[in-house]
């Protein structure tokens, strides 16, 4: 088995830097589009055989060191009682705005309400047969609450920010419920066979460090502390968190995901030797000529300076119009340039 990814999560030495890409199963791959053309996005997420097929594609095509479950962060929110659609982009018909709205939300039973996610994990563990580890994932409570309150995507998330200050009791009740749901969902993924968990806090960085510490940190910390993760590393990725790494670190977890706005070496200096890191190439670099991609890969590796506990990744998801051969080249460069 290729254990480089898991070893790096635990800060152990590896023979070369492991690499995978956020959104590595996605629209930039013709093979993904061939599957996606036959069904809607939600149907793809809810059909274990198809979700497993697209999860495996980048392992075979790119040669990455980990597979990540194909799903969506909002999958477990729908059975809380919110109708979800993609038109495109996620839309909830009835956003959560009042205490009555929060009280109507239920905590789903993952085995009963999202069995397709757990079945996908079981299929993947069998299909991967130890080739590379399988990462499960979920959205952080704050990012999930952003969509639930706004009802759709937003540039500034003003509605949930207003709730924090104007209706703090509603915000706290919602975050408590979402955190409980998240904990049940991620623990079910671990029971089903996920070998690592990534928590995506895509919108955590829209808050000031003070607001993050007050309104977000307690819930993410509670979530991470509530995971049954003796042998399952947890990666915590907060996009835009470069100005508050030490605060985000207080949430716990084993690996800090970094976006491209921070120098990886300086981030490691701040976080200390006991926190592994993942990142952090700007996704747009994959539009560059191959020799430029190689230079940029080397720069990120040089910033890490050979320290154990580095997983190479993009600073956010791969973009849908990136040429697949450039992603393949990036993976090859990481492996070749980091070979011990």
Swiss-Prot record:
* Reaction(s) the record says it catalyses: uroporphyrinogen III + 4 H(+) = coproporphyrinogen III + 4 CO2
What SUPFAM superfamilies has UniProt attached to this entry?
Answer: UROD/MetE-like
PROSITE patterns, per this entry?
UROD_1, UROD_2
Which Gene Ontology terms of cellular component type are present? cytosol
Q: Which cysteines link up through disulfide bonds?
A: none
Its Gene Ontology molecular function terms? uroporphyrinogen decarboxylase activity
- Residues bound to substrate are 23-27, 72, 147, 202, 316
Q: How does it assemble?
A: Homodimer.
Query: What NCBIfam families does the annotation carry?
Result: hemE (TIGR01464)
What function does the entry list?
A: Catalyzes the decarboxylation of four acetate groups of uroporphyrinogen-III to yield coproporphyrinogen-III.
Q: What is this protein called?
A: Uroporphyrinogen decarboxylase
Taxonomy of origin reads:
Bacteria, Pseudomonadati, Thermodesulfobacteriota, Desulfuromonadia, Geobacterales
